[in-house]
């Protein structure tokens, strides 16, 4: 029997602390971390299960208040759509997007910036959707601007 589960991964980077150490290289370091985090997978059974699957959706946010772990979106098991008209990936993304909206409305509000890659996160409030390369470039540019070391169009 083979099981393909929803895998929710979460990481946080204290950019303000990283900036104290790296100064002008902070944005590039964050970009490298985000790229590696998105494109890497746990290595257990990597040959048995060919786990080089890329994510179906990615959400990157910049917040000034506190990081938010959104794992609560999967407190209940996600089921494929009625009559199997949508798969687990779409149903998981829908549950996640709904939960994100609830958390933003009920608790801390929207982040300063939300960047999305993947076809499933269109419902996330105020998220800008990009292919991965453009998401990383936009993130880097935003960090340069917010850290006060903007680099004319880079």
State what each model feature region is.
Residues 1-154:
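Basic polyanion-binding and macromolecular-assembly surfaces
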